[in-house]
Amino acid sequence: MSSDFEGYEQDFAVLTAEITSKIARVPRLPPDEKKQMVANVEKQLEEAKELLEQMDLEVREIPPQSRGMYSNRMRSYKQEMGKLETDFKRSRIAYSDEVRNELLGDDGNSSENQRAHLLDNTERLERSSRRLEAGYQIAVETEQIGQEMLENLSHDREKIQRARERLRETDANLGKSSRILTGMLRRIIQNRILLVILGIIVVITILMAITFSVRRH
């Protein structure tokens, strides 16, 4: 499990390093190369998102007691991903302004105003994205807590079942002991009755012997 996560981590590190390098190169490229580079970065950003999803799935499969470290790493990677997307958006805005100026011949003031407006919208989107990410993280943590509670309940249920089994075994043993004691008492009573009968027979025999002896004399 952790080996798969670490493999995705390495792929993510290599990919984000490439994306960072390409984003930094975009402003310095000729228009044709910029267009190709922007398309390439978009594709790699999607690949990075897929890697994050795979890593997130791997973290959910890790036992709760070992999950904390991986969850912290995931938060760091998501923040890094958010920064890359922000840098790329700014790079695209600059690229779009440049293309628009070339096609429409807009003056510098209009371009600056539009760029400022786009940057403002971008910042709003980033804030919304951070709120969504925070909500998602809360949902994930809530799910983890729920899973831990379910596991604890499952352990408690197993303990209760084992206790019930022990009680059943104890009841069964008590039942056997009770039957054995009852049998022993019955045999003791029978033996005492036999002794009493034998004693009576002996007394009667002695009395009869004495009676016969007296009559002969």
Swiss-Prot record:
Q: Name one Pfam family in it.
A: V-SNARE_C
Coiled-coil regions, chain positions: 31-92, 112-178
> Which InterPro entries does the record associate with it?
GOSR2/Membrin/Bos1, SNARE, T_SNARE_dom, v-SNARE_N_sf, Vesicle_trsprt_v-SNARE_N
Q: Keyword Cytoplasm on this protein?
A: no
Primary residence:
cytoplasm
What is the superkingdom listed in this entry's lineage? Eukaryota
Where would you find this protein in the cell?
A: Cytoplasmic vesicle; Golgi apparatus membrane
Q: Does the keyword Transport apply?
A: yes
Q: Which GO terms describe its biological process?
A: autophagy; endocytic recycling; endoplasmic reticulum to Golgi vesicle-mediated transport; Golgi to vacuole transport; intra-Golgi vesicle-mediated transport; intracellular protein transport; macroautophagy; retrograde transport, endosome to Golgi
Q: Name one GO molecular function term.
A: SNAP receptor activity
Q: Report how it sits in the membrane.
A: Single-pass type IV membrane protein
Q: Which UniProt keywords apply?
A: Coiled coil, Cytoplasmic vesicle, Golgi apparatus, Membrane, Protein transport, Transmembrane, Transmembrane helix, Transport
TM ranges are: 193-213
Q: Tell me the residue ranges located in the Extracellular compartment per UniProt.
A: 214-217
Identify the residue ranges that face the Cytoplasmic compartment according to the record. Answer: 1-192
**Record's GO cellular component terms:** autophagosome; clathrin-coated vesicle; cytosol; endoplasmic reticulum membrane; endosome; ER to Golgi transport vesicle membrane; Golgi apparatus; Golgi membrane
By sequence similarity, the record places it as follows: Belongs to the VTI1 family.
Subunit structure comment from the entry:
Interacts with distinct SNARE complexes that contain either STX5 or STX6. Interacts with NAPA and, to a lesser extent, with NAPG. Identified in a complex containing STX6, STX12, VAMP4 and VTI1A.
> What biological function has been recorded for the protein in this entry?
V-SNARE that mediates vesicle transport pathways through interactions with t-SNAREs on the target membrane. These interactions are proposed to mediate aspects of the specificity of vesicle trafficking and to promote fusion of the lipid bilayers. Involved in vesicular transport from the late endosomes to the trans-Golgi network. Along with VAMP7, involved in an non-conventional RAB1-dependent traffic route to the cell surface used by KCNIP1 and KCND2. May be involved in increased cytokine secretion associated with cellular senescence.
Name of the featured protein: Vesicle transport through interaction with t-SNAREs homolog 1A
